[in-house]
Amino acid sequence: MKKIILLMFSVLCVNSFSYVERSEQVGNRGLELIRESNINQNMGLSKESGSTQIIDAYGGNGKFSKTKGLMIGTTSNFVAYPNITAGVTVAYDKYKYKPDNSDYWGRNYDVNTYFSYKLDKNLFTLGFGYSQSRHVEKRGYIGNLEFGRFLTGNTYLYTGFEGQNRNYRNSEDLKFINYKVGVLRQDTWKKFKFLNGIEFNMDNKKYDREDRGRGNITFVSRASYYIYDDLLFDVQYRGTKNSKFYNNVVGLGFTHYF
């Protein structure tokens, strides 16, 4: 039954008609998956293998583009080294660039990998990513480094930075670093699980191409319902406030523990 539910959802996701600000969802969701996996260990919610799988369909509306997408991801502990967690996410997006005012939908493909090491109450996370876009002929390379500390078993405070190098075929490349600090908390109540977080982040320079401020406040709220003891249905909202715009993301998905 669980396999049938996941298969039906994945088919529906491909034809989703909702919209999203792709770059904010893809990178943040993977990092949250690593953080959440470590919080689950602290709270005793992980299953025997310590593995987590997700499938998400997400949608929203940003200032510069409308997109619709699907993401799958997984994390797992190393059997011999339970304090080490590795994860990977794969995302496919279709996006429509608003300033063009056309009906053309471009496509974007993303792969991100993450590794974390937990030492007592401290967590170190390293991430690498690759992104390719067909419409604007862009290749992106992403690196993440994060350090955090568990204030309690279910509350995680972190800081770090993300570097991006975007290579465009017919225009100038774009390189920047984004610095961040945030907090994430997870709670449970009966058959529900709640994840809430807020993050402050700032780029090291102002984009010349985009009408946006350097600083952002991003918050995420996810409510999950236990269909089975190892399968959850997720509803998510993500918002990003910039001095010149507000982007929002809505997502539906499933999480599976084993």
Question: What do these predicted regions represent?
Answer:
Residues 1-21:
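Classical Sec-dependent N-terminal signal peptides that target proteins to the secretory pathway
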Residues 19-257:
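Transmembrane beta-barrel domains of bacterial outer-membrane proteins
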